[in-house]
Amino acid sequence: MRLTAIFFMAMQATITAVAQTMNVQTGQVIYSIPSDQAGDMIYTSGTELTILDKTFDISQINKISLDESNVKANTVDVTYNGNSAQVRVPYNLMSYLTVNANNGHVSIIQDDRVTEEITYTLSGSSNDGSFYMDGELKATIVLNGLTLNNPDSAAINIRDGKRIALILTDGTTNTLSDGKNGSQKACLAVKGHTEIDGNGTLNITGNTAHAFWGKEYLQLKKGAGTFNILGAVGDGINVNQYYQQNGGIVNITGVGDDGIQVSFKTDDNDQTIPLSEDEDNTGEVLIKGGTLTATVTAAAAKALKAEGPVTINEEKATTLITLKATGGVTVSGTDISGSAALKSDSQILIDAGTLTLTATGQGGRAINSDGAITINGGKLTARAEGSNYGSSGRGGGGWGPGGGGWGGGSSTSVHKYAKGVKADGIITINGGDMNIYSANHEGLESKTEILISGGTVYVKASDDAVNCSVGDSNTATGNLTISGGTVYAYSTSNDGLDANGNMYVKGGVAIAFGGSGAETGIDIDERHAMTITGGQIFGIGGRVDGSFSGCTQSYGYSSSSTRCSSNSGYFVLSQGSTRLFAVKVPTSFSGVVLVSSPSMQKGTSYSIASYTSVSGTETNGFIASPTVSGNASNSVSITGR
């Protein structure tokens, strides 16, 4: 004992004289104390050594060494090596952290006396390791070339409920995976709110549930690197409060449920916490920059799903979003759910960005909103390529687009239609460039109203290309208003533009190609009317449907027995040798025509003919004041009304 006391006195004298760092190792934990911070070391009863309020049991000390390493306050280093891990704790945290390291598994509990943010740097590799941290103050987790697999539970589990900054060291690749059949919520689980930054790469695989889970919000900073979800039994990313992406690259594939799911945070009784108590609890997706790519394959899965609103813009950086859902439907009695590339239980706002959204599963939708959809800008491609799902309670027949529903007098009990863009609320388009396609049902549909004042909107669908409908077929309403922009609506077997309420054209361009027979280019319900006060209109289909009321701009249409046809090229509206406009023909087409233009006059004769050679500035299939060459074919005369 006397020799031990002499040793510690000599050690203290040495580090003070030489300005070195003393490292006290107990098991897999090393406590580093610079000479200028050591102060008095108190040796008590031959069994304890106290340094800076940290008391060591001498029997538990494996080694004390001196070196010239620099010690950074408030920074803990965890280095994994095979089935082991070494934890280095700085002098100022020795009495504030409870550290346990068992082989490759590390647990650190912060004392509630901690007043400054602690940084934990994780590096190295382990096939049987984990990191657990809990505390009551915000913290930073730095991943510096970490490969970590926990065969039993989460690879990283942060129970600290405050802000957690997750830093991906520039240029590093970090890979996390967890075990199968566990009870963990995710491979990487964070109780607090997570903010990801740093230009590194993070790969996560969730073998029990989600890949990433956050009880509170997840935010990717503008300088964030690459975040790859390589697989998950559940969701790729599952968070509460909100998801915000200001930059970085997020790739999600191989998941068993949704790509990203954002929910409202709930209390211990599973009740949603109101905004008055938690201003962050919006259930919202905010994408202000960066790249997001997600593919989901499960039945009824959504590539991006929010219980709250979805807002997409380029406020922070260029935004590129590619979402794909390939799964079919899930059915429970009369409750049916389909897949979607983008789904909001609230509303969707798109101000900017390039979005490519695809649904290929049965009954799938590219965009599905329980509320409104507003598009002010950006470039949107939305495709529903799957078939419709339907079953009937009795009778024969089956669903067919454009056929008005179920054949054989059957009653529909369960169905899900594959649609390009669908909203229960109002669809408002003020700008942007849209290309929407539906292989087997409506392209752009609102269950309330559609308002278009700008942008270019191209829609191709087997059923109605653009449809507004509120209520059942006997009492349906739903107004469609076009006051600007260029709308090109092409239905292969039903109506191009279909308003079950009133249709108002006040400006812009409205082009509509409809099916044959009873289908029309522009369809107005017989109980309502079309009002034309401006704009350029071209509609062609099996007939001209509906009535006209309150029109202040001249219009005209051909009779049911007078048809305009074209194998290719353009339909051109002319008054003598003056060409008013030209409309590109999507395919070989023949039908009854409805036209209107500010240049038309009541009682004046006009012609519509097919030309193969037309020049001029073309926008979404429309050319104003075109130049034509060659001979006209299939000319039809109409009179302005």
Question: How does the language model describe each region?
Answer:
Residues 20-70:
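Compositionally biased alpha-helical segments
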